[in-house]
Amino acid sequence: SCMKAAPMKEISIRGQGSLAYPGLQTQGNLDTLSGPNDATRGLTSLADTFEHVIEELLDEQQVIQPSKENKDADLYSSRVMLSSQVPLEPPLLFLLEEYKNYLDAANMSMRVRRHSDPARRGELSVCDSTSEWVTAAEKKTAVDMSGATVTVLEKVPVPKGQLKQYFYETKCSTKGYAKEGCRGIDKRYWNSQCRTTQSYVRALTMDNKKRVGWRFIRIDTSC
């Protein structure tokens, strides 16, 4: 089978401030560019600026992580969100984690990648995947670290009411290339298959004895 992505790591920052976007200044816009060459330079400039912002966020993340003494810190995950409505975008910490994992796998620093061959930006994944927010109402049950099936609670009590639990899940795409095996594998000599893999995240759940608590459960996180 194809190489599987590394499990997502829990990110602990609750109660220690939040990440904020550094000042973002683009170098002109596409409407003011005069020709094809200028357009190419403009797009490259915007891409470099975006990567520079991510680099600063990752550097800041290492500074604001709490100490191990904060018992509530591990309740936060890059793939779990408590919200009154469906999140409109992927979680920022998830995007940072994905980008960092890519750089680690490619053995490159961000500064090196910004100045590398632009053609590398068009690389394709071995397996196609889809990601979306899933509610506890849709998920209903999950498997915890002990192998027991637990009920995922839809709402979490907070001082001013209740918030819903949302999980950002990634799984193999059911369309296109996934049915034919892994991309880049010579089908004449090798059999391959794209498979959805899971990782543990922290969620509010209830076991079969009606005991409610925060437990690590498995969700789909990669293909």
Swiss-Prot record:
Keyword set includes Disulfide bond: yes
Chain residues in the propeptide: 6-114
Keyword Transmembrane helix: no
Localization per Swiss-Prot or TrEMBL: Secreted
Biological processes annotated in GO: cell surface receptor protein tyrosine kinase signaling pathway; modulation of chemical synaptic transmission; negative regulation of neuron apoptotic process; nerve development; nerve growth factor signaling pathway; neuron projection morphogenesis
Cellular-component GO terms for this entry: axon; dendrite; extracellular space; synaptic vesicle
InterPro entries documented for this protein: Brain-der_neurotrophic_factor, Cystine-knot_cytokine, Nerve_growth_factor-like, Nerve_growth_factor-rel, Nerve_growth_factor_CS
Domain of life: Eukaryota
Keywords: Cleavage on pair of basic residues, Disulfide bond, Glycoprotein, Growth factor, Secreted, Signal
UniProt similarity note: Belongs to the NGF-beta family.
Protein name: Neurotrophic factor BDNF precursor form
Organism lineage: Eukaryota, Metazoa, Chordata, Craniata, Vertebrata
